[in-house]
Curated annotation (Swiss-Prot):
Keywords: Cytoplasm, Hydrolase, Nucleotide metabolism. Gene3D superfamilies: 3.90.950.10. It catalyses: dTTP + H2O = dTMP + diphosphate + H(+); UTP + H2O = UMP + diphosphate + H(+). Its main location: cytoplasm. This is dTTP/UTP pyrophosphatase.
Length: 189
């Protein structure tokens, strides 16, 4: 019998993306300490955080397949996580203005059927933003719970000029790659 799937994330965006697969799942989240070390390579940092989330839930539910994920925005190798306040959010958007950065989403899958890890990088380029553009964007979008202070799926056309790679990855879960891993463990949608 295929174990039940648990998404170890409270992100509504990850829930919506995983729902697209057709695989039934529940959501269980445990608090974990997220690293924000700028000295670690982006994929390694994201994988560490994703694994911590998956393993915290898997310890309590060892008969389930647990999916943990972590998304970070990196500008010139420096991580931009979720802002602490609105001024930090404005500062992040100013830094990203007119520049290309990377979004890394790492996924850790823990299951009695096996263990999988993956990290996907997507390149995102911002338009040149004025202070008025930044203010208007922040009025429309709750930037406080978003890595890099923006959401691709929420008025992204206002601030983003191009994306090279998986747009689902920018939103928070590289669905195609996750499905390949789940298929490898025997899951079918």
């Amino acid at each position: 019998m295929i174990p039940p799937v648990i998404l170890a994330s409270q992100s509504p965006r990850r829930r919506e993306l995983l729902e697209k697969t057709g695989i039934p799942f529940s959501i269980i989240v445990r608090d974990t300490e997220e690293l924000k070390e700028a000295s670690m390579p982006p994929q390694e940092l994201c994988l560490h955080n994703a694994a911590a989330k998956a393993e915290a839930v898997f310890r309590e539910h060892p008969d389930s397949t647990v999916i943990g994920a972590d998304t970070l925005v990196f500008l010139e190798g420096f991580p931009l996580g979720k802002p602490e306040d609105e001024e930090e959010a404005r500062s992040m958007l100013r830094k990203l203005s007119g520049r290309t950065h990377h979004v890394c989403t790492a996924v850790a899958i823990r299951s009695p059927l096996g263990m999988k890890n993956l990290a996907v990088l997507t390149e995102v380029t911002f338009r040149e933003l004025t202070e008025k553009d930044i203010r208007h964007y922040m009025e429309l979008v709750d930037v406080m719970d978003k890595a890099g202070s923006y959401a691709f799926q929420e008025h992204g056309e206002m601030i983003i000029s191009s994306v090279r790679g998986d747009t689902d990855n920018v939103i928070g879960l590289p669905v195609r790659d996750v499905m390949k891993c789940l298929n490898g463990l025997g899951y079918r949608a």
